[in-house]
Amino acid sequence: ALSSAASDVYKRQGKKAMICVGGGSMKRFGFLDRAVAYLKEAGMEVELFEGIEPDPSVETVMRGAEAMLKFEPDWIIAMGGGSPIDAAKAMWIKYEYPEITFEEMCKVFGIPPLRRKAHFCAISSTSGTATEVTAFSIITDYQKGIKYPIADFEITPDVAIVDPDLAETMPKKLVAHTGMDAMTHAIEAYVSTANCDFTDPLALHAIK
């Protein structure tokens, strides 16, 4: 799946990719090195933004966006769990619109059109958040002690890779936590006031 993702990125005329990752599991299990190798093999220049913390902060988003402005990628690739993918989504907005404030980013469905500078690929290593296919991102302002949702279809990834090889590296505790997270999302979908005849059977099947 990783090699096909690199090929897909290259076919979309990608020349420079920034990979955003978290605390080290992607590197420890060799997936980060594989992704870098596949992208370089496809003729792309690659730069890393590492160390994205769980529940990513506003400060991390701003640092990542600054790194993107310097490197000028045409592809942003987020690898790992929900945190690096959420952080990279927010960095993407700030990269495309350097003048935008965090407060403006948090206006629901208020993000201006993206993809002027870069497209987005999410490679998920966990089963819980499904942020690789959603229009949402959660960023924490630790000074205020508040988690802010960013909600806009503009930040839905262009490419989502769900490779079982990555999920197999999860420790048992994380498997349990993300499994409950996935079930919670299924229950939320079923009881949501925005449900419909199409989503209800999917939600029930997911719960089972």
Predicted regions and their residues:
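Short glycine-rich or small-residue beta-strand-to-loop segments that form or flank ligand, phosphate
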Residues: 17-22, 47-50, 76-79
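Predominant activation on well-ordered alpha-helical scaffold segments within soluble catalytic domains
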Residues: 33-36, 47, 62-65, 89-92, ...
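Single conserved hydrophobic/aromatic residue that forms the stacking wall/gate
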Residues: 1-6, 10
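Carboxylate- and glycine-rich phosphate/diphosphate-binding segment that chelates Mg2+/Mn2+
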Residues: 136-208
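Nucleotide donor/acceptor-binding cores
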Residues: 14-17, 118
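Glycine-rich phosphate/diphosphate-binding loop of Rossmann-like nucleotide-binding domains
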Residues: 18-38
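Glycine/threonine-rich beta-strand-loop-alpha-helix active-site module
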Residues: 59-162
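Short beta->alpha junction loops
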Residues: 48-58
